[in-house]
Each structure stands twice: as C-alpha cells, then as structure tokens.
C-alpha cells in the first residue's frame, strides 16, 4: 500500500480481548484525572461518547461489505470492527463506574439517542456516513498520536486502569486509522465530499466540546462551588498539549490527495505494542 510518496506495508488490525479492572470494589476519587475537575469531566464525556460513536462507525463500514473486493481490505475491516467493538465494551464498563460517581454521561448511550442516530443515518447517504467515519477516524488518530507521543500527557496523574484503557484505545486507533478511509475510496468516495465533511466537523469541534463540557460541569455541585478553579483548569486543558496545535493537525485531512498513512506513526506503534503487549507488557494480564 502506498500513502502519498511513502510505501506502507499492509497492516491487519488485531482484535485483543482485553478486560480492565473496573469492578465495583475499585475506588476512585471524584476527579479521577489529576484531581482536575475539568479534565475529569472531559475524559468522562469522551468515554461516554465512544460506545455509540464506534457502533455508528461499524455500521457505516458494514453497509459496504459486499462491495469490498480486495481480500486485504476485507481482513483489515474485520480487524477494525473487532477493535471498535472491544473499545465500546470496555468504555461501557468504565462508564457504568463514572455514572455511579455522578458523571452525567449516560444520555449519549441511551435508547432514545440511538433512535435519533439511526434516523439521522437514514436521512443521509451511506457514502456521506462513511465519509463522516473516515473523518472521525482522523480525529481519533490525531488525538491518539498526541496521547502516546507526548510525555506531558503521559505524566498526568490518574487511575492506572483508566490510563491503560486510554493507551490501549489510542494504540488501536493508530493501528486501524486508515481502514474506513480506504473503504471510502474503494467504493468510489470522492475528494469533494471527503473534504467538505471534514471541514464541517472541524468547524463544529470546539463549540460542541465546549458546550457539552460546560453542561457536564454545570451539573456538578462541587465544581459549581469553585468557579475560579474551573476557569483555571479549563484554560489549562484547552491551552495544554492535547489541544495545542490540534486544528492544524486536523486540517491536514483537507489537503487534496491526503491519506492517513501520510502521517508516519510506525515507530510509535511498535513502541506501544511492545510496552502494552510485549512479553512484559503492562496489559498482558488483562488479555483474555
């Protein structure tokens, strides 16, 4: 496979059946990421959005399964679906814990919201839905690369199981970052739609994140009692390593002829595959 001028070997995403220790006996502080109310609500919101979002990604790819003729791409799609399914399963287990702690994230995974998502998917074309998935996969790949490559982020204190979940999820997002994109191209998806969809998503990103985060914090009585702390932590989050320069990295997708594998994350993948799943990997004990 060739991405731009870079030759990339065919990689098959591996479905790892991981189960993290999110049992009822595991105790967390209220603000489980660095005792930071804003960052904790942000991570909780992301975790709440992942399971239904990834199910939508799977649906968008599956609808084209009978039009995928390349056996390598078929195998990559199977790995993509397996990985996304496992992500949803483990995030739901974490979400149950977070909801019990008072985080209001259950609405996004409710039956009512599922019906609305399915109605929306029926209103748009399958190709537009797939273009949305390809664009969203670039989002997650950009965030994943930051999480795994920046020492500033890895140094943030937090619960070990939560960090293991995030690192595992990030690793696998990089492993399958180009699958939906390649399906989109293989079934005739064009550049105009691809770029327009991403431009719209970029425009909506910060307003949507800011709004949902504000609503989440507004429902937190403890956070409401400390508004100056919330403002300080919000400035640190949006001015910090996760968001700094984010729009520029997302905008690479808008270049005509762009391919996700133009961004070389091979060395980062090898490093984290070894750190998490090597002989003494941090997650070996969680693999079933």
Labelled PLM ranges:
Residues 2-288:
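Non-heme di-metal
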């Amino acid at each position: 496979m060739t991405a731009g001028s870079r030759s990339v070997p065919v990689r098959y995403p591996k479905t790892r059946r991981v189960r993290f220790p999110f049992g009822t006996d595991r105790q967390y502080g209220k603000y489980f990421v660095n005792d930071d109310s804003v960052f904790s609500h942000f991570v909780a919101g992301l975790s709440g959005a992942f399971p239904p979002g990834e199910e939508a990604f799977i649906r968008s790819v599956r609808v084209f399964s009978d039009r995928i003729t390349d056996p390598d791409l078929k195998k990559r799609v199977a790995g993509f679906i397996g990985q996304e399914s496992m992500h949803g399963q483990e995030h739901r287990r974490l979400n149950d814990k977070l909801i019990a702690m008072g985080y209001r994230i259950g609405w996004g995974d409710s039956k009512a919201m599922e019906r609305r998502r399915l109605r929306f998917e029926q209103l748009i074309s399958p190709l537009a839905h797939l273009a949305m998935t390809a664009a969203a996969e670039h989002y997650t790949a950009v965030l994943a690369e930051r999480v795994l490559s920046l020492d500033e982020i890895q140094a943030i204190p937090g619960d070990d199981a939560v960090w293991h979940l995030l690192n595992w999820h990030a690793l696998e997002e990089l492993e399958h970052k180009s699958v939906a994109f390649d399906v989109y191209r293989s079934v005739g998806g064009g550049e105009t739609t691809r770029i327009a969809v991403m431009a719209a998503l970029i425009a909506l990103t910060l307003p949507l994140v800011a709004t949902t985060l504000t609503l989440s914090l507004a429902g937190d009585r403890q956070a409401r009692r400390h508004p100056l702390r919330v403002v300080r932590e919000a400035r640190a989050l949006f001015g910090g390593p996760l968001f700094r320069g984010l729009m520029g990295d997302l905008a690479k997708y808008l270049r005509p002829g762009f391919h996700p594998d133009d961004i070389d994350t091979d060395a980062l993948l090898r490093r984290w595959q070894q750190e998490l799943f090597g002989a003494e990997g941090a997650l070996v004990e969680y693999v079933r």
